[in-house]
Amino acid sequence: MSSIKTIVGNIDNTVLSFTVGNDVVLDKKLVDFDCISTAAHAYMLMQLPKNNPIISKEEFNSLLISLNKIIELNNEKKFKIKEVDQDVHMAIEKMITKEHGELGKKLHTFRSRNDQVATDLRLLAKKELIKTVDVSLSLIKSLIIFAKKNKNVPMVGRTHMHPAMPSSVGLWASAHAESLLDDCNCLFSAYELNDQCPLGSAASYGVPFKIDRNLTSSLLGFSKPTHNVLYANNSRGKVESIILSSMSQVMLSLSRIAQDLLIFTMPEFNYFKVADNFLTGSSIMPQKNNLDICELIRAKSSSVKSCELAIYDIVKSAPSGYNRDLQETKQPFFEGILTTISCLEILTSLIYTLKVNKNDMIKAFDSKVFSTDRTLELVAEGMSFRDAYNHVKNNLDDLKNIDPREAIKNKTHLGAPYGLDWSYYTVRTNQISKKLKKEKINFERKISKLLDSPYKVI
């Protein structure tokens, strides 16, 4: 069996292919972040030791030019990671060494691929969480616009999928918006846990030299470095599963919106109308217009959850310290993020096309939907609730069908159809937008300053 020479030694060809796996493809997502973390690490090396720095100012400036060039090549899809490179880290080191000789050989001083990839993944996660909150806000805003526009349109409220009580389109749409507002809090919680820099923890056990981990953490826009160097590496996989757990909550909200739309756009209901260009057809049935988008979102909510659980299962029995098992967490991590963002984007576009069929909404009401309203009228007249309940239950056929537009006007308490406080949604949305803007600007400023080149998250 033949071997091939790599930066870390001679490896059998078959072993190399097996161990590299899909990293030559997956690691393309990490190229920018590996360049960014390398710049921060090199800046620290420029400070150590003070009397004779490992990297000179001139070398650092030359390095920045090369790292920005690699980022540009990657954005143009021209940067290549070969199997012999094994991963993005060695591919970049090889290119820097080819261009700058000794400088490239110095870059791995005090650094392991273990803390290197952990840092890259956390940088990627910062960017993707910011983007996820941003697109979540877009969907929230579209739902609130739709809700306010149709706030007084009556809609049969359902429990167990059967008609229950008078409700409104405004209540339905804003309920889903409120769910997503809570999901944004979950995303920010994951962001806070992720916002710690593992760089400098090396292979899990630190290095015998007083490096400045606070410096690299600050340069990269993290709120702080991870403390324990062993946990810095042990947290890999755990942090990714937490991030996907927050995204699973987003997908749970999207799945329920999708399911409602699938039901309420059926001809039997015809409550809502989706733009024709958001529907697909059948290869054999000419009349079909299918809301495949919502069916796929419903299924993809399970896909994202499975990505989260895949990562959890990979790391749950791993011993302390780095283990190659972690390589298998990349694909589900990237897939879960991409799926969540794409579902948010497509559903936002769909909501903006959504129309309400008011007449069909009103026709859906029958007298029994007002059973609870009638029961509470009798209570207001002096009858005990249970007696009123039994009286109405025993005389359902005698109930009168009233105008649902008038019925929902009686529900004025906090959070009811006519008691919705629209400023509540404005305040919460603005709070999230403000926090998002702060994190986005801080991250962009830090990375732009480090690279001496403009960097945009979104």
Which functions belong to the PLM regions below?
Residues 43-52, 171, 241-249, 374-381:
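Short, well-ordered beta-strand elements within core beta-sheets of diverse protein domains
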Residues 49-53, 82-83, 115, 205-211, ...:
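Short, exposed beta-strand "edge-strand" segments with a Pro/Gly-rich flavor and a Y/T-containing core
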Residues 122, 126-129, 133-134, 148, ...:
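Charged, flexible cofactor/metal-binding loops and thiol motifs
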Residues 65-73, 234-237, 394-399:
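A short structural micro-motif
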Residues 1-37, 102-103, 270, 285-458:
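Glycine-rich cofactor/substrate-binding loops
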Residues 1-206, 211-218, 280-281, 292, ...:
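A helix-coil-helix interface module used to build multimeric assemblies
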